[in-house]
């Protein structure tokens, strides 16, 4: 956005300027678009500075000083995850930048952006939000520095974090700024974290071990994490406090979950679903979500490696069927729409309108998970409203196909055979994404995932249903390598399972320790904070590379690593010419595509 655009709107200045590490796309899958539209709906003038040049001071002042505040986010993804691979190598592309160009955002973008803003504007309130700020709101282990870092509020000259999804919270905060309150006095809004020098007025709070303790004592870190994790419930979560060397971090309880009407109001806003017209190149991240629909937020799966618990929460917040149908009718009018809805879902597709009766009054259970180790008997597993929704979407003129691109939680789907039949009949595009993640019980327990036996039962039922329907449809399983709890023996067990599946696995993700997840706590401390038991953690680069190579043992480029792993584990029985062998005794030739000769 430029000052010329402000003039075209008849504005002399903005009320709020949002600074983002992503290119600007006016689509509800992009957080900046949602926050901007919500603030606009509330009557505020909102400007957006997307991917500012941090070497040019004027990049942050091109819209002038906003009347109320700057809002700062790294974008949809943590900037360190966006910039580096799981093995800390610099990425060569960026899906959230025009033309897939890398290096359009700095490392630790939120901190850098806040510093740049403060260089020019000494007193303007700076509010941070999004994944990077939310998940770094307390002292946290940083994989890229391999150390415990302070809260992002202690490192950056920001005044507040609006953590979680944040729509209601940011409107409340900006509204109070408009009414003349100082940002330092706004300390009572749910879903915010702020810094202070004293906590004398606070009551009913829990104090976490301080920064010095958690940065020098791994047991203290695990204790702090467990308390933090357990208190992320909007109904029983307490205010949390953590002392840092020069400040005190205070997190208010999480925001209450949005009602269906509130969800509808957010997604009914007039998103264009296009990038800003100034871009001459495509934004790759838009391709996969252009014709997708968000039906709900939150996930009660509780996977240890996933940040959704700390960001969106475990409670499902669903839109109404009418709101979803309105969005789809609007979507069909876009000239690029060819009749296919690529996805209707959320973090996982099959939790729409699900939950249990106690959650809306008492919160989620403290001492157990909804799906691990088995689905809870109190959980509503009836997918009938989702089935009705999928059927109604197919009736919308112009819609030819409705697919589930976000994947399903297979152990939940197994609780409702009618749903499984329905998606196999109408909503699978030929391949269904599911995530068993691993086969070893050591690892699936550390992940809080069901056993591989549950996955095998699902595969059997899926094949049975497709055979009955006369369809040839497949499963794309997703696996994680080098997760805490995984030993070399476990990695080989997974490789043997992949061998027995009979087809090559491409969907392999190296475990990346991201802030504020249970898995990251185990990675750093070597302990499970809930049991106190030690957890084996594969940390060396070579070991992590071996574990991944074992999963893709058919790739000739992985031969040396696979052979080394098998010899190290005393599994030479898997080297040979037998049908159960992973590799042959002789290294295969590596095919290289012929390159173009230099002129």
From Swiss-Prot:
The name this protein goes by in its record: UPF0313 protein UNCMA_01890
UniProt cross-references to PANTHER family, sorted A to Z: UPF0313 PROTEIN YGIQ
Annotated GO MF terms: 4 iron, 4 sulfur cluster binding; catalytic activity; iron ion binding
Family per record: Belongs to the UPF0313 family.
Entry note: cofactor: Binds 1 [4Fe-4S] cluster. The cluster is coordinated with 3 cysteines and an exchangeable S-adenosyl-L-methionine.
HAMAP family, sorted: UPF0313 (MF_01251)
SUPFAM superfamilies xrefs: Radical SAM enzymes
Top-rank taxon: Archaea
Source lineage: Archaea, Methanobacteriati, Methanobacteriota, Stenosarchaea group, Methanomicrobia
Names of the cofactor(s): [4Fe-4S] cluster
UniProt keyword Metal-binding present: yes
Family annotation (InterPro entries): Elp3/MiaA/NifB-like_rSAM, rSAM, rSAM_horseshoe, UPF0313, UPF0313_C, UPF0313_N
A Pfam match: Radical_SAM_N
All copies of domain Radical SAM core, residue ranges: 281-557
Binding site for [4Fe-4S] cluster: 299, 303, 306
Keyword terms of this UniProt record: 4Fe-4S, Iron, Iron-sulfur, Metal-binding, S-adenosyl-L-methionine
Disulfide bridge positions per record: none
